């Protein structure tokens, strides 16, 4: 299995948006994966707006649905958005997780095909 994209998401709660430049850089430099952030909010914070100007396909703004907490929306969209990414093999991750070892996220997947669902948790 060859991952083609990593997907992370966040909203305005916490400092998660400010982590994305490092998260994007680490996924690319360690695993050679392109990382995309989905931000749930009415507008992008400056850090993501600036990043989007450099890497237009790396940041997506998702306007929040009314009466549903944006943190919950960010969690759900990260799980559901890959269904819209045709012809991609997507690894979903938390915004505050960066790869430290290529073997864990690249070589470990070599024995799987794109029809498999692989989880890195025991839940």
Positions of predicted regions on the chain:
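Surface-exposed alpha-helical segments enriched in charged/polar residues
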Residues: 25-29, 80, 110
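A conserved donor-nucleotide-binding helix/loop in the catalytic core
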Residues: 65-91
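Amphipathic coiled-coil/heptad-repeat helices and related helical stalk/stem segments
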Residues: 19-20, 44, 75-78, 101
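Short, surface-exposed basic-aromatic patches at helix termini and helix-loop junctions that form
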Residues: 52-56, 84, 107-113
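Hydrophobic/aromatic beta-strand patches that form the interior of the parallel beta-sheet core
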Residues: 36, 91-93, 118-119
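Conserved donor-nucleotide/metal-binding helix-loop-beta segment in metal-dependent transferases, i.e.
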Residues: 100-123
């Amino acid at each position: 299995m060859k991952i083609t994209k990593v997907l992370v998401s966040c909203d305005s709660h916490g400092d998660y948006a400010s982590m994305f430049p490092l998260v994007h850089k680490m996924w690319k430099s360690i695993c050679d994966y392109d990382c995309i952030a989905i931000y749930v909010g009415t507008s992008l914070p400056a850090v993501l707006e600036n990043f989007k100007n450099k890497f237009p396909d790396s940041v997506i703004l998702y306007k929040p649905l009314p009466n549903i907490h944006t943190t919950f929306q960010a969690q759900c969209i990260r799980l559901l958005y890959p269904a819209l990414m045709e012809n991609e093999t997507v690894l979903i991750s938390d915004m505050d997780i960066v790869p430290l070892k290529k073997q864990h996220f690249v070589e470990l997947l070599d024995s799987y095909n794109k029809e498999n669902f692989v989880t890195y948790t025991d839940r």
